């Protein structure tokens, strides 16, 4: 489902160039979950952005579902992001002028994949029943994260890319949300690649890998 070979990425600064990924190889099977760990600057978030086509590698190959993401034009990448991927980050990027329900429906509507029965199931499972007409800013941080999770899953993506998705929540809320998130991803038949610094969060994943010096240092 995801195959990465000899991936390099660096960034230019005023008087230097910093290498982030240095020949990374990584594979991920369908319907699995992987925790991506490593120190700050090890390339975790960069890797997610490259997979999603939000940035381009210096060299190397990224194949998603048999397609060469690294060589695609932006229009093709945008279509994949819209219908086959979901991005869940610390900042929820909810639309403040849309209701909770319309936020949940947003990505599914873009790719024409509405499912009213599944929509209701997500709302109930995520504890959002009765909140549908509210605006996001009227909810707690934990509730906003649940809206973002519902939005990310309603169109049943092939791959969810998550970067510290519970980083703005307290430990108890983080564990509760992560347990539910990982369960819903499995039930949707999606794969999940999640950046986290937390061992407790990583424990919810099928597999745990660690980046160090721009390459895969551990895989368990």
Q: What are these language model-derived features?
A:
Residues 2, 8-204, 208:
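ABC family nucleotide-binding domain
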Residues 208-220:
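H-loop (His-switch) and adjacent beta-strand-loop-beta switch element
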């Amino acid at each position: 489902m995801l195959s990465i070979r000899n991936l390099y990425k660096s960034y230019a600064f005023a008087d230097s160039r910093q290498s982030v990924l240095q020949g990374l190889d990584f594979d991920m099977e369908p319907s699995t979950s992987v925790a991506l760990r490593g120190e700050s600057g090890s390339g975790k978030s960069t890797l997610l952005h490259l997979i999603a086509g939000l940035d381009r590698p210096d060299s190397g190959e990224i194949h998603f579902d048999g397609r060469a993401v690294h060589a695609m034009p932006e229009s093709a990448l945008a279509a994949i992001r819209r219908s086959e991927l979901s991005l869940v980050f610390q900042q929820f990027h909810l639309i403040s002028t849309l209701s909770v329900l319309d936020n949940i429906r947003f990505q599914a509507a873009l790719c024409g994949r509405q499912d009213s029965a599944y929509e209701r199931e997500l709302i109930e499972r995520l504890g959002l029943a009765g909140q549908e007409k509210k605006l996001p800013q009227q909810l707690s941080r934990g509730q906003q994260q649940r809206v973002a999770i519902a939005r990310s899953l309603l169109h049943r993506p092939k791959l969810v890319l998550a970067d510290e998705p519970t980083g703005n929540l307290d430990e108890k809320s983080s564990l509760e949300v992560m347990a539910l998130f990982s369960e819903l991803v499995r039930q949707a038949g999606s794969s999940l690649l999640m950046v986290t610094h937390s061992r407790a969060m990583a424990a919810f994943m099928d597999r745990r890998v660690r980046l160090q010096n721009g390459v895969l240092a551990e895989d368990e």
